Amino acid sequence: MDAVPELTLNNGVRIPQLGYGVYKLPPEETERAVGTAIEAGYRSIDTAKLYRNEREVGKAVGASGVPREELFVTTKLWNDEHGYEAALAAFERSRGELGLDYLDLYLIHWPVPSLDRYVETWKALQKLLSDGSVRAIGVSNFQPVHLRRLIEQTEIVPALNQIELHPQLPQEELRAFHAAHGIATEAWAPLARGSMFSNSTIAGLARKYGRTPAQIILRWHLQRGTIAIPKSATPSRIAANFDVFGFELAADDIAAINELDTNHRTGLHPDGM
């Protein structure tokens, strides 16, 4: 089994560069799927309050036989849980659902600029970090304007920003902002929900390397220094998505994938929340 490379977050905590996401996995399928992922070698599991499957993720983690300290568990607070006290309560609910003593990473799922409470919410996450309830704190779907406010008005720079990112939406400007401020970039929908598998460039590279289109795209993420959290409920695809460490894309092939940028989103823009 290949070891997953790790990246070091800005507070020294290490995170696997490839994780397993459980978005839209029904609760009745989640425990099995997460167990399959852990058996395949994944050590990072990403869930959220919104997904309604935290309890099943926790059950799979507990039943895996893998020591807790070898697993990296992420969850996120939802939009109706913004505010200092509300965020603290949301964390305790999620920790209770997961059945874990601590979390590895806790994220604000969306900035919700119309609500404008993400700064006080972030201050609650800072308290959770200082209390030792979570090893690292970060955000999701934040734009530079949102990140800049957190940096200027609070004490801790987010360790990570989880954003939609794939070859059609490479997010170069946001990635540059992250790099300048020591914020790790994590990709949700790293495979663009499968919409690029028939793309001629991706399909051609899959033939060239004898790999699946998904493996080509995931390899692109890894070689660019992005953390990727693909999701699948199919055991064979869960395993195939993990099998991306035995080859490397040539520099010109990375460049060819970089040219596929169309600024296409498969999900919502943060300003629309």
Model feature map: region roles:
Residues 25-37, 83-98, 145-147, 169-170:
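Short, acidic/polar
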Residues 42, 100-103, 134, 158:
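A structural motif
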